Amino acid sequence: LLERMALLDIDCIGLDWTIDMADGRRRINSVQEKAVQGNVDPVVLFASEDAVEDAVRTVCKKAGPKGHVLNLGHGVLVGAPEEKVKHFFDVSKTIKYD
C-alpha cells in the first residue's frame, strides 16, 4: 500500500506507529521521494520521560535529516499526561543532525 500511496500527487505521507519508520521511508522512496510524518507510538506518553525521549530519538534517527515531520503515529490519546506531551515537544526541539 505504501508503494501505491507514493504514486499519488501529494508531498507527505503519514505513517502510524505500526510501521517501522526506516522501512516505511525506504518503501515510499523506492517509488518516489516523499516526506513522511509520524510515527511515535502514542502509548509512549503513558510511559516514563526516558521512554518518551528514546522513542522520539529513535523515530528521528530512522527517518533521517530531511523530509520528516515528527508526530505521534495517531494523535494524543485521551488521558495522556500533559507533562509527557510537553516532554515530547521539549525533546523534539533538541534533535540535531550532523
Question: What are the functions of these language-model segments?
Answer:
Residues 1-98:
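Active-site loop segments of alpha/beta catalytic cores
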